[in-house]
Amino acid sequence: VENLLVAQHQQLKPGLFSGLLKAPAFRRAQSEALDRAATWLERIGLLEHANRQASNLAYGDQRRLEIARCMVTQPEILMLDEPAAGLNPKETKELDELIAELRNHHNTTILLIEHDMKLVMGISDRIYVVNQGTPLANGTPEEIRNNPDVNRVYLGEA
């Protein structure tokens, strides 16, 4: 739970004396933060590990926990840089489902930087392809899949 509470401290702002005296506003804010943390731990499938340190979780679980840590702050946009790096196929599929849920059910825009094209094509509405720092193409997954420049650069001449 502490893993998710740490992300919410900036939003709570109960004040020093309010916290020391355990004022009603402090208790209410603390309760809401705990509820949000528990909700997100359940959503990512880690509620049974609520009191474990992040470093003691499996690598895929650590990745999901990082995303939940962001989501407790209720962001409008979430930037994920190579979230599938180092994950096995099962963990990548779970990540794909989690990202789709965030986008579809939590009104969160996802900015995804990723090399796993199966993941990118499966969850993206729009894709921007960059080749060695230069923009190459942008469009829907279907447009990118059929783009001759993308195919030439990434698949080679057929």
Label each PLM-derived region with a short phrase:
Residues V1-A158:
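Glycine-rich phosphate-binding loops of nucleotide-dependent enzymes
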